[in-house]
């Protein structure tokens, strides 16, 4: 693996919780995923969180969250959360010429949205793996199949790997889920990331700021990044295979982190649930400080 470049970003996240009434919640919490160090991909240079009165929470993947308690929020008021980061992201290029060795025993199990034990997915993984001399070629076959056969369509939901094989279309969540599921079906460890994509003139028309992508564990290389969504066209196919471009910023690992309860980036609970209406809105802004290595 080589590291030919690095990019730095200033990232602003803001969430607002507006109590539209008719009463105030007895209990209200929101858990916000925090960008963290994730070697060798990224390093957090600084982080500022407001308001300060939050609790740090960790999950089974090592993801970190700020838990805020806004119980008793008065009707007609808005609570605002602001988080500012400076993050350095590495460009990584992997040499897959040597693909012999052992694999890991974890990140190979089926789970919600990663249906690697589904008969249709198992059969497809076996078919695509035929006559491939090693694990690296198998993963490339999965990657190429996804690019050639899935029809990209933003749907706003994660329908999982099995859903990606249907006629509804797929976006980054299904592209990633299918790559992970096909890999795990053949015993190849694979992980699912949710994060942010810095959009430039090349990616703005083909992706969204909120993004998902995988990495896979390959012999002699370790964890190797790829992006089947951005690599779905033939002209971009090689650019995003075994190449971590430094426009990807990891927020969480895992398709179903327990703290998020099926959500992405943040989750919000208040009760009694019928006591009032609390509207949560949020946005991200990403500024490139010194974008290089592309």
Where are these regions (language model features)?
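Low-complexity, Gly/Ser/Thr/Pro-rich intrinsically disordered linker/tail segments
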Residues: 244-294
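Acidic low-complexity segments
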Residues: 60, 79-169
């Amino acid at each position: 693996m080589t590291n030919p470049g690095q990019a730095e970003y200033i990232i602003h996240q803001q969430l607002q919780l507006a109590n539209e009434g008719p009463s105030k919640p007895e209990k209200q919490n929101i858990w916000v995923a925090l960008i963290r160090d994730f070697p060798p991909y990224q390093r957090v240079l600084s982080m500022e969180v407001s308001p300060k009165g939050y609790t740090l929470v960790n999950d089974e993947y090592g993801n970190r969250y700020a838990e805020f308690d806004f119980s008793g929020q008065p009707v007609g008021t808005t609570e605002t959360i602001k988080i500012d980061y400076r993050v350095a992201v590495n460009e990584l290029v992997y040499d897959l010429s040597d693909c012999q060795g052992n694999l890991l025993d974890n990140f190979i199990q089926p789970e919600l949205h990663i249906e690697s034990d589904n008969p249709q997915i198992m059969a497809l993984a076996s078919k695509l793996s035929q006559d491939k001399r090693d694990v690296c070629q198998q993963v490339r076959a999965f990657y190429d199949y996804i690019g050639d056969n899935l029809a990209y369509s933003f749907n706003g939901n994660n329908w999982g790997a099995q859903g990606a094989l249907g006629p509804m279309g797929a976006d980054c969540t299904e592209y990633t889920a299918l790559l992970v599921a096909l890999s795990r079906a053949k015993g190849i460890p694979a992980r699912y990331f949710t994060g942010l994509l810095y959009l430039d003139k090349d990616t703005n028309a083909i992706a969204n700021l909120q993004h998902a992508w995988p990495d896979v564990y390959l012999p002699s290389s370790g964890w190797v990044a790829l992006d089947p969504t951005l690599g779905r066209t033939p002209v971009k196919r090689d650019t995003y295979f075994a190449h971590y471009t430094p426009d990807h910023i990891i927020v969480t690992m895992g398709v179903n982190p327990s703290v998020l309860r099926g959500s992405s980036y943040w989750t919000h609970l208040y009760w009694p649930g019928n006591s009032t209406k609390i509207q949560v809105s949020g946005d991200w802004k990403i500024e490139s400080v010194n974008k290089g290595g592309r």
